[in-house]
């Protein structure tokens, strides 16, 4: 497994001081974003939310390894990847508040978040083949969890990329849980990375709580992908929080003996301690980064609140040219409900 923290001094890594500080800055931003999002969701300010605490190093490290024109295919828990890739936090807030038009950002090479499990994997393989036909140089980074490897779309995307040499890095964040199912009940394979052999591609493992290691590994894998050699990366990390705000993880992992050990390896605390020991950052830098992150998020919340709420009837648009009878009936029922109730006065918490 590829690892930097605990095994190499900073000057022995292949990461510049500027990049190391940028990684830390985005890890603080994304941790603060996650904390703020949970608090806002609990107030009923936005819809259900999938927390990613514990996975900041994995996602931020991968995002920073991408070239400017590389395409990101995120899953529903990839908010840190999106933020580090350049998606404004206000856009993610607005998406969670029901604005479908903020599902993706036209100024950043990021596909919309895929909520159905694994559907983005064949999309990335297809986009990679389109890149081969066009002769461009960008690569695709598609992100998914360990649970997605049990889906048929995982097989289809991996097989397609392996056969045709699509420029794709398949980035699996193995956070230990597919909702409530532990990895050992997800697959009989020795590891997720070992699955790559069946598709004729390289499979590698990286310490997903080490942003320097993730950065180095994903950067090198993207270089290979651009040469026609797709790679499967298994980033070993841990989901510290619930699957979503609708989940109660105490029902299935209270007795998990690995929890204390993973919390000792909290990626943000671990990285901050390492950078201080190596003389890369000091207390003043850390405090300034925290203040910047809090100011940015406060402004993002204000910006999101300044946008008018979406029309509830929009949920029926852009799927069918002509609504089928059952949806037509549902739309009429919604319209009748809205004429009798002010949505702003309803308690939807």
Sequence positions of predicted segments:
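Glycine-rich ThDP/TPP pyrophosphate-binding loop and its adjacent helix/strand module
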Residues: 119-296, 306
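Glycine/Thr-rich phosphate-binding loops of Rossmann-like dinucleotide-binding domains
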Residues: 37, 82, 241-243
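A broad, low-specificity signal marking well-ordered, structured residues that form hydrophobic/aromatic
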Residues: 2, 101, 231
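Conserved acidic/glycine
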Residues: 1-57, 256-349
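A generic structural signal for short coil/turn motifs at secondary-structure boundaries
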Residues: 12-13, 49, 81-82, 114, ...
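Short clusters of hydrophobic/aromatic residues that line enzyme substrate/ligand-binding pockets
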Residues: 4, 103, 111, 252, ...
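A general secondary-structure junction signal
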Residues: 76, 235-237, 319
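Cofactor-binding active-site loop characterized by glycine-rich and histidine/acidic residues
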Residues: 32-35, 44-166, 185-188, 193-200
């Amino acid at each position: 497994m590829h690892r930097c923290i605990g095994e190499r001094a900073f000057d022995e890594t292949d990461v510049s001081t500027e990049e190391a500080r940028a990684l830390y800055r985005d890890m603080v931003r994304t941790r603060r974003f996650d904390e703020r999002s949970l608090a806002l969701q609990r107030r009923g300010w936005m819809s259900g939310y999938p927390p990613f605490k514990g996975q900041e190093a994995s996602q931020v490290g991968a995002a920073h390894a991408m070239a400017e024109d590389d395409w990101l295919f995120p899953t529903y828990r990839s908010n840190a990847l999106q933020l580090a890739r350049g998606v404004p936090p206000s856009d993610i807030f607005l998406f969670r508040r029901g604005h479908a038009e903020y599902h993706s950002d036209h100024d950043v090479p990021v596909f919309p978040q895929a909520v159905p499990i694994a559907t983005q994997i064949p999309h990335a393989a297809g986009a990679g083949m389109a890149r081969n036909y066009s002769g461009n140089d960008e690569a695709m980074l598609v992100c998914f969890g360990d649970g997605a490897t049990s889906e048929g779309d995982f097989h289809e995307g991996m097989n397609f990329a392996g056969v045709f040499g699509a420029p794709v890095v398949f980035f699996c964040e193995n956070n230990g849980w597919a909702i409530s199912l532990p990895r050992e009940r997800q697959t009989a394979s020795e590891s997720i990375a070992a699955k790559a052999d069946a598709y004729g591609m390289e499979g590698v493992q990286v310490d997903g709580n080490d942003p320097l290691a993730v950065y180095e590994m994903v950067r090198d894998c993207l270089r290979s992908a651009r040469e026609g050699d797709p790679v499967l990366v298994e980033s070993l990390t841990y989901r510290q929080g619930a699957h979503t705000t609708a989940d109660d993880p105490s029902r299935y992992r209270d007795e998990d003996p690995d929890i204390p050990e993973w919390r000792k390896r909290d990626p943000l605390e671990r990285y901050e301690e390492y950078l201080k020991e190596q003389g890369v950052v000091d207390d003043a830098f850390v405090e300034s980064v925290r203040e910047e992150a809090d100011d940015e998020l406060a402004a993002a919340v204000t910006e999101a609140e300044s946008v008018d709420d979406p029309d509830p009837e929009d949920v029926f648009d852009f799927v069918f040219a002509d609504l089928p009878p059952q949806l037509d009936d549902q739309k009429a029922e919604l319209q009748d409900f809205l004429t009798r109730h002010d949505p702003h006065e309803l308690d939807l918490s």
